[in-house]
Regions:
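Short strand-loop junctions, especially beta-strand C-caps/beta-turns
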Residues: 18-20, 104, 133, 160
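Phosphate/ribose-phosphate-bearing ligand recognition and processing surfaces
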Residues: 128-141, 147-150, 156-167
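Active-site beta-loop-alpha junctions enriched in small/polar residues
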Residues: 48, 106, 160-162
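Amphipathic, non-transmembrane alpha-helical secondary structure
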Residues: 30-33, 37, 116, 140, ...
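Internal catalytic-core helix/loop-beta-alpha segment
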Residues: 78-137
Length: 190
C-alpha cells in the first residue's frame, strides 16, 4: 500500500516568536496544526508500514553556534539545544506524534536517509508533503535533498503552511521549488 509522509520543518519557538520570529511565521501556526491533525499519522520509527507518517525536524545548534560557518553568516543565536527557542511551538508540540529528527544544518541528510530506507524496504512512498519554516532556507533545502534522494516520489510543499524570512524570499523559494518539479499547493499566484 502506498504511503504519504508529512514533514514538519522547524516549527520551533525561535522561528515563530523568538530571535528569528516573524508575523508570517506566527500566522501559519494554526494552519500547520490543522494540517497535522487532519493527516492522521503515527510515530515515524514505529508505525505500521501501511500507515501515513508525520516527521518533525528540529533545527539544533550547540553553544558554539556563532563559531560555525552558519553562525558567522547569520550571527543570531537560535535553536540552542535544550532552550525555550529550540522547543516546538506549544500548539504544534500538543499535536506532535513522532520523535523529532534533530538537524544541525539547513537540510537533513538523516531525514532523507530514513525516508529512502522506508521507500526501499517497506514499499514505495506515494507522496512527501512539506510544511514549516523557513521556506527560503530549511524547507527548500529539505525539499531539494528529498528530491535528490527520492527522485520518483511526488514532493509537495503547502505554501499556506510555510513562511519565509520575508514574504518576498518565501515567494522566490516557492518559484525555485516549482522549477525543480516540486509541486507547490495553496500558494499565491505570481
Amino acid at each position: 500500500m502506498a504511503k504519504k509522509v508529512l514533514v514538519v520543518v522547524d516549527m520551533q519557538n525561535d522561528f515563530i516568536t523568538g530571535s528569528l520570529g516573524t508575523p508570517e511565521a506566527q500566522a501559519i501556526v494554526p494552519k500547520v496544526v490543522e494540517k497535522i491533525q487532519g493527516f492522521g499519522g503515527t510515530v515515524l520509527y514505529t508505525q505500521d508500514s501501511a500507515a501515513d507518517v508525520i516527521a518533525f525536524t528540529f533545527d539544533t545548534h550547540r553553544c558554539d553556534y556563532l563559531e560555525t560557518q552558519e553562525g558567522r553568516n547569520l550571527p543570531v543565536e537560535h535553536c540552542l539545544k535544550g532552550t525555550w527557542g529550540w522547543q516546538l511551538e506549544p500548539r504544534v508540540e500538543a499535536v506532535r506524534t513522532s520523535t523529532p529528527i534533530e538537524k544541525p544544518t539547513f537540510g537533513s541528510k538523516g531525514l532523507a536517509e530514513v525516508l529512502k530506507a522506508r521507500h526501499t524496504y517497506e514499499g514505495p512512498l506515494e507522496e512527501i508533503q512539506l510544511v514549516g519554516l523557513c521556506t527560503d532556507i530549511c524547507v527548500i533545502s529539505n525539499a531539494l535533498l528529498l528530491k535528490a534522494f527520492l527522485p520518483e516520489v511526488k514532493l509537495t510543499v503547502d505554501a499556506s503552511c510555510c513562511a519565509g524570512v520575508t514574504p518576498e524570499s518565501h515567494q522566490r523559494a516557492l518559484e525555485a521549488m516549482k522549477a525543480c518539479q516540486i509541486e507547490v499547493v495553496n500558494g499565491e499566484q505570481t
